[in-house]
UniProtKB/Swiss-Prot annotation:
Superkingdom, taxonomy of origin: Eukaryota
Region Phosphatase sequence motif III, annotated ranges: 237-248
Name of this protein: Sphingosine-1-phosphate phosphatase 1
UniProt modified residues of type Phosphothreonine: 103
Keyword line: Cell membrane, Endoplasmic reticulum, Hydrolase, Lipid metabolism, Membrane, Phosphoprotein, Transmembrane, Transmembrane helix
Modified residues (Phosphoserine): 101
Organism taxonomic ancestry: Eukaryota, Metazoa, Chordata, Craniata, Vertebrata
Site (described: Stabilizes the active site histidine for nucleophilic attack): 248
pH dependence: Optimum pH is 6-7.5.
Function: Specifically dephosphorylates sphingosine 1-phosphate (S1P), dihydro-S1P, and phyto-S1P. Does not act on ceramide 1-phosphate, lysophosphatidic acid or phosphatidic acid. Sphingosine-1-phosphate phosphatase activity is needed for efficient recycling of sphingosine into the sphingolipid synthesis pathway. Regulates the intracellular levels of the bioactive sphingolipid metabolite S1P that regulates diverse biological processes acting both as an extracellular receptor ligand or as an intracellular second messenger. Involved in efficient ceramide synthesis from exogenous sphingoid bases.
Localization per Swiss-Prot or TrEMBL: Endoplasmic reticulum membrane; Cell membrane
Residues passing through the membrane, by range: 121-141, 152-172, 193-213, 216-236, 246-266, 279-299, 311-331, 348-368, 409-429
């Protein structure tokens, strides 16, 4: 057997849904014998195209696929609640009985016998969700180091955009259920290869280490511990949730390493261009919009298209906001002779200002997001002559979803790097 055949055989085995199900059982996740899902295991399965795993029902990425509903804490109108028999090992609704904001779909009833692992992997999967991003990047920009925060966003946008587009090109379905138990339905309508959670969970800690080591004074061992812990937690959480095969996660990890090798040397150049070039905002907005339109042509409707527009809008807004802040002198960064920076001692005053900035800043950001959401969807429907009485259906049109996500999160990003720092400077807490 040649090397190529061996690698193909290995990849085929790593893609098997039975391996995902085995990992779930090892971690204490099972379908209760009395649940409807257990009774359905014997139902007839639908066989896909050659080389694809067996699966039932709707295919991920299809037009009538459900939109997403997070596992542990995503926004977008999900609902929390307790399932019947909520004991430590009793049946519970996957994702704490979360309901999909666009279709009303809920996770299936499952039995979790290892709650510490359940909550640990919920934390891991949240490290790749909107709630985390909307807290993490502003915290860096407002409280820690805007220089690092801006560059983290550039890397995140590159990695996530390439990952989402690759999914829509390869079009591999999610692991078949059964045997896999879907603990999450938020991303169930998207394709599987590669895992963009694994990509962001690999890119962010590596980029944090590369950007901060030498700029800040801290032991090298901290970074060497952070990277494998963060990345492995996110990667394993996607297998635990039943969202990805082992192959998806490994491919996402390796794909991210390749992207960082190619693009990381350009990050300084991109950030300097965003801040200093006179016509940077026009180029940023136009380029990100073109990339968004291209991604929308790769496949029929799925929730990943809206995510891609959201990522591009956020990146464009943060870049334009950093340009405005630099132009008006709001970007106060230490000179090169002050490097490496010493980590200041944590005092009551420092902690209080940090909490005040994050609370006040997030209130302003969420206010901007809600206002823009209420404006952009009806306006996009009106301009496109699409009925807006059914928001779920309207958002399946590119003419509505792309401008809604792009403009709304573009303003969110602009607020993070310009409007909020301007308010901080005005009231004296910058």
């Amino acid at each position: 057997m040649s090397l190529g055949q061996r690698l193909a055989l290995l990849a085929s085995r790593l893609q098997e849904p039975q391996r995902v199900a085995s990992f779930q059982r090892l971690c204490g996740v099972e379908v209760p014998l009395s649940s409807p899902a257990a009774d359905e295991d014997a139902e007839t399965e639908v066989r896909g195209a050659p080389g694809e795993p067996r699966r039932r029902g709707r295919q991920p990425g299809a037009e009538d696929s459900p939109a997403k509903a997070d596992c542990c804490g995503a926004p977008n109108g999900v609902r929390n609640g307790l399932a019947a028999e909520p004991g430590p090992t009793g049946p519970r609704r996957a994702g704490s009985q979360r309901r999909n904001s666009l279709t009303g779909e809920e996770g299936e009833l499952v039995k979790v016998s290892n709650l510490p692992l359940y909550y640990l992997f919920c934390l891991g999967t949240e490290l790749g969700n909107e709630l985390f991003y909307i807290l993490f990047f502003p915290f860096w920009i407002w409280n820690l180091d805007p220089f690092v925060g801006r560059r983290l966003v550039i890397i995140w946008v590159l990695v996530m955009y390439l990952g989402q587009c690759t999914k829509d090109i390869i079009r591999w379905p999610r692991p078949a259920s059964p045997p896999v138990i879907k603990l999450e339905v938020f991303y169930n309508s998207e394709y599987s290869m590669p895992s963009t959670h694994a990509m962001s969970g690999t890119a962010i800690p590596i980029a944090m280490f590369l950007l901060t080591y030498g700029r800040w004074q801290y032991p090298l061992i901290y970074g060497l511990i952070l990277i494998p812990c963060w990345s492995s937690l996110v990667c394993l959480s996607r297998i635990y949730m039943g969202m990805h095969s082992i192959l998806d996660v490994i491919a996402g990890f390796l794909y991210t390493i390749l992207i960082l090798i190619i693009f990381y040397p350009l990050v300084d150049l991109i950030d300097n261009f965003n801040q200093t070039y006179k016509y940077a905002p026009l180029i940023i907005i136009g380029l990100h919009l073109i990339l968004g339109i291209f991604s929308f042509t790769l496949d029929t409707w799925s929730t990943s298209r809206g995510d891609t527009a959201e990522i591009l809008g956020s990146g464009a807004g943060i870049a334009c906001g950093s340009h405005a802040a630099y132009t008006l002198g709001l970007s106060l960064e230490p000179s090169l002779h002050m490097l490496p920076l010493a980590i200041p001692p944590l005092t009551v005053t420092l902690f209080g200002k940090a909490i005040l900035r994050i609370v006040l800043g997030m209130l302003l950001v969420l206010f901007v997001r809600d206002i823009m959401k209420k404006i952009t969807i009806p306006l996009a429907c009106k301009l496109s002559s699409i009925p807006c009485h059914d928001i779920r259906q309207a958002r399946q049109h590119m003419e509505v979803e792309l401008p809604y996500r792009y403009i709304t999160y573009g303003m969110v990003g602009f607020s993070i790097t310009f409007l909020v720092p301007y308010v901080f400077s005005f009231i004296g807490i910058s």
